[in-house]
Amino acid sequence: MSVATAALARTPFTGNATTGELTHWRAVATEVAQSLAVDALERDRKNEQPHAEAQLLRSSGLLDLLVPAEFGGAGGHFETAFEAIRILANADGSIAQLLAYHYFNQTGIAFYAPAKQQGAWWERTVAHGWLWGDSVNPVDPTLLLTVEADGYRLNGAKRFSTGSGVGEVIIVNALVQGGENDGKVLAFVLPTDREGLELVDDWDYLGQRLSASNSVRYSNVRVDAAEILGEVTEEPVSTLLIPGLQLAFANFYLGIAEGALARGKQLLLGRKNAWFLSTAPTYSRDVIFQRTLGELKARTAAVAALVEKLGRAYDLLIAKAGDVTAEERAELAVAIAEAKIVSTETGVEVANRIFEVTGTSSTSNDVGLDLYWRNVRTHSLHDPVDYKKIEVGQYFLHGEAQPISLYT
């Protein structure tokens, strides 16, 4: 029952997205976003588990975008997935988060499982239409796996388990006690209806209300040996999962900023008069408001250029699989940390300052402009951006990377 720790010989991801691939999935994501936009505010206020939204993602094909074509998926690239996340965030940051976490939970197959075992996992996720949640929050006490015949028993609890409320399966990390894997952290997959696994519907926060990020409790949950993906190690290619997830964050912060700008523009153009001290005929013709929007738009465009570049770079490095070096991994992780910094600050600033051009009337509860700020403000606290700044500064000054963790 020992878990192999050999380097991954390959990943199923190769090359970069074609123009055709990007065009197709942009159209799919845009259609989904338009559907989400219709009642985003109403759904946010209800604060219910997003089962209908999960089904929308499933029926659109977005859940299987990254599954290799040889196993029944779309055979897409991370660059395309990042863009889909960004487009959805224009309309609904919660569902963009749900999709982002799904992608990196699902592709844990490639990051953790031995190559010869990956095909069966990919085929199962397609056949059953799985949405993948997670239960790996590292700031909670460690989950414990206790050895028993042909498997384990899992005990403990995790908060902030994104997607667990609506996912068919969740990926879990836990520390093994006893046996030949004693002291190892294993990644494994559990169905959310497993006996002893309790989904606690306690996600009631300022924003990202529909990300299904509730708590999960485990009471002597059976974990079969066949449900183990592999060991969580510091092998360079397997540890690229976390920078990839951080880049997904940058994309949905960017998408929220773009959504706030679009909604702000709509509201500003709808204002028919002007401030009484202005000589402009309308608010939208007032250079003060034009200047503010110009500044916010330019900053958002700069973030977009950076994350698009990094999406392509991520695909290229993932394709090297076991040949990825620690130095290459560190360089890309720091570049993604830079994107995390500017996307966080730009997203929060845009979602906040958009009110400067839309006026008091835009704070009405039925307008819902606050949804963008509440969403980006909530998730941008996931890990302190100041530590990302330190990570970048340390690498720039000394060429020293931060220790590998579930945040770096």
Segments (PLM) and residue ranges:
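Intrinsic disorder at enzyme termini
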Residues: 1-21, 389-408
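C-terminal helix-coil-helix/basic helical segment that borders enzyme active sites and/or dimer interfaces
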Residues: 41-44, 301-341, 355-358
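Glycine-rich phosphate/cofactor-binding loops in nucleotide/flavin-utilizing enzymes
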Residues: 358-408
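Glycine-rich flavin
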Residues: 49-59, 64-166
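DPxDG-like acidic metal-binding loop motif
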Residues: 157-194, 359
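Glycine-rich phosphate/pyrophosphate-binding beta-alpha loops
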Residues: 159-164, 245-249, 382
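Glycine-rich beta->alpha junctions and the first turn(s) of the following alpha-helix
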Residues: 205-301
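Charged, amphipathic alpha-helical oligomerization/scaffolding segments
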Residues: 28-31, 256, 263, 295, ...
